[in-house]
Amino acid sequence: MSKEKENKEKSASKPVKILTLDTETRGLFGEVFRVGLYDGSRYRATNTFKNLKTVLSQYTTKYDCHVFIHNLDFDISKIAKDILPEADLKNSIFINNVVTVFKTGLNESQITEENEIISQPITFHDSSKLVMGSLKKICEDFNISQEKAKIDLKDHILKLGWALDADGNPTNDPGKYDDRESQGNYFMKVDPYEPELNEYLRLDCVALYEIVTMLIEISGLPIHEFLKCPTTASLAMKVYQMNYPEDYEKAISTNYGYSKWGEFTEDFIRKAYYGGRTEVFQSELNGGFHYDVNSLYSYVMKVNPIPIGKPRHHKGDKARNVFKYWYSYRQGGGFLECDIHIPTTLHIPPLPHRMYKKLCFPVGNLSGIWTFEEIELALEMGAKIKEIHQCIYFEKTDYIFKDFVSYFEEIKNTSDGAKKTFAKLMQNALYGKFGMQRVRQTILPVTEIETCEEKGYPYVELFNPVYGQEFIEAAVPSKAPYIQPHIAAYVTSYARILLYRGLIKQLEKGDVAYCDTDSIACEAIFDDDMVDDREYGKWKLEGILEEGLFIQPKTYYEKYADEIKPEEIEKEISSFSRNVFNYPEKSKVKQYRLVKGSETMKFKGIPGAYIKKLNRGVYYDILEKLKSLQARQERGEMITKKEAYYSIYKGELKRRKFATMLKMGSDDFDLKQEVNKGILLTNRQKRNMDYIKNTSRPHVSCDF
């Protein structure tokens, strides 16, 4: 038995111990000055992680230790010199260059002369990959009791006189208090032994422990299965697999394998895997409505059949006959490669198409691959198929997500707190796991070179002085059976179809200004039978718009009007009424309240802290500049990049990711990176925009 396998078996034989850890640092780039560790009953705090390593080692003699940290990438960077030399890179997980699970191995100092292990490996998990968002927001969503929840330092910081506004200027005004700036100032100055700081740190650890243990309990998974799930998506897949085994087996019944046929089929289908639809149709909307679909992806997964089983490949006339058969009888499902003409008269065309390095929805002559259902939608809108090249056809379909979604829909609608949040997480995360890329960049120990060479995996050799030895980054394919791209492609296709029908319906009644995956901003109100605040697949009114300024996809400003909204409250019934009239203890009463109009600002690629500093004036200024640039272009003037660039902020200092610094060979994991953000206003958009006339036209495709 190998030493690695022996150590794994010893670790697995021990009971699991869940711990939570948090660090406080002198700003984004400063050193750690306080570290807290909580095991569910006992809390410890020291000024360095090095001091806590001894405590953790003591735990490992009895337990298989799993330490959860919220935003692991940041904390691991801060303690890299204390922990990286012991890294077990083979069993650590890096996703999109971010460390998600970090495992330490054994080193010589952890072994006695008798070769008895006195310290087992420790696994660090990133809780923010299981439940996204700030710890404060998660505590609110999970209804963590006040004595165990994250505390707000605002009053304390104001009392100390260390509060800052959004521009970093001192302030005593609670209304001008900026949380990010003020907390940054506080952590730069505070004494490590200040009671308020230590209570803040303790409750961060306690709150995270409550959240993690709640997740384990609600998931219903054995703890060892839960700990195999590094992300929300992997957790959702595990819950689906364990609780709905028959549906799961159907979902993975398409065997892509590693044959040439499997590679061809997967590549073919992935070309039909498009994302959500985000488009600006007009840049200004003066009065209108903003609607969102309730749980769009969950809904289409619940009510639509998904292809399963072994697909067949057909070409030419056979492919044409297969599609014709499906079109007549709707039996099975599949993907069609064809040349299709989309009428140039359509203001909002139906089919997604990759052009100009964007996902566009053009008119004209398109060559591509789409689901049968989206081709059917295009034909409804007057499209004409000019030639069919080939298709992948699944004879069988099934409602493989109906029970899964229905179960969590019931929990979401009848629960609150942790259960409701968990239900949302499970429904939203599952489908994307089926579309996961098969090949991923993976960091491995240098001992894996031989395996990579045998299997033909490309790799590069690297070295980091803190790690103390060479390692590699390799492109390793996954054999996971749940990688089923046709499922993800079908789910997104169904979602686009539902959105499109909403767009066309509203276009018949007035202007449509904007859409984003599951939302529409438009001039006219939706029909009553399409609207409901909770029902899956129905449209929920998010707000009545006074004004909308839409610059580009995911970059817009909206001002909502004041509204009078009904709400139900529980009112206690007096004992007299209960006794005399046999009334219940509590009764629901409808009342009305004035909701002041709010503002929504989105800006793609800009961190939330900077978006908070924006205002309507910024979006209006950009729009006016776009009109000016358009007028100049129409006059034939040349416009330089400098003239077309609109700066949002300059000189922001950002941290590099832990994996980036590891691969760069740096011994400084706090290396600063200066970032400037802005928008180049002459970039090609997803439609031909006319900012002056407040309209747009779809691009014209000329593929054939």
Feature annotation, model-predicted:
Residues 4-20, 28-32, 38-704:
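Conserved acidic
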